Amino acid sequence: MTEYKLVIVGGGGVGKSALTIQLIQNHFIDEYDPTIEDSYRKQVTIDEETCLLDILDTAGQEEYSAMRDQYMRTGQGFLCVYSITSRSSFDEIASFREQILRVKDKDKVPMIVVGNKCDLEGERQVTTGEGQDLARSFGCPFMETSAKSRVNVEESFYQLVREIRKDSRTDTKGPGGKGGKKTLKCLLL
């Protein structure tokens, strides 16, 4: 069974834990208890393939930023979450992405931009179009979610797995588009 290491990043209070717990336990937590780091596992079937999601729910607070490099190194795909009710959390997403790309030393990493709390339309500070534009500039999918109303919760995680699958298929293409990883040869003199 394939295992996917998913990492949820974003500022404090955007609903990363609420999304994760809604996916894992089908229940909404409405009290805010800042996360340092929590790990969850769930077996699911995505596009007729049974797989294991290993989800790392991370700290949004700046005081835990030293831990970020480690989980960014090991993660295969990233849910970059902001709250539609917080302009500053939206503005932070680009720096999370830059840090992920720097740590992984890649130009592109499987990720999805997620605008959470879409049930709070009356408090919206970030338009859907702005979220779509940001995701387009990153070359990744975009979704608005609500952990409270269970809108697009499963879909956002499942779409991230599809992005990882797509990325791993393109990674294994060698010269001429045939499968198999490229091997590099070193010669020490």
Swiss-Prot record:
Record-listed GTP binding positions: 10-17, 57-61, 116-119
UniProt modified residues of type Cysteine methyl ester: 186
EC number: 3.6.5.2
Highest taxon above the source species: Eukaryota
Residue stretch(es) of the prosequence: 187-189
Database matches in InterPro entries: P-loop_NTPase (IPR027417), Small_GTP-bd (IPR005225), Small_GTPase (IPR001806), Small_GTPase_Ras-type (IPR020849)
Topological type in the membrane: Lipid-anchor
Renumbered ranges of motif Effector region: 32-40
Ranges annotated as spanning the membrane: none
GO MF annotations in UniProt: G protein activity; GTP binding
CDD domains listed in its UniProt record: H_N_K_Ras_like
Gene Ontology terms: biological process: signal transduction
Keywords of the record: Cell membrane, GTP-binding, Hydrolase, Lipoprotein, Membrane, Methylation, Nucleotide-binding, Prenylation
Record's subcellular location: Cell membrane
Family in the record: Belongs to the small GTPase superfamily. Ras family.
Chain's role: Ras proteins bind GDP/GTP and possess intrinsic GTPase activity.
Protein name, entry field: Ras-like protein 1
Species the sequence originates in: Physarum polycephalum
Designated gene of the protein: RAS1
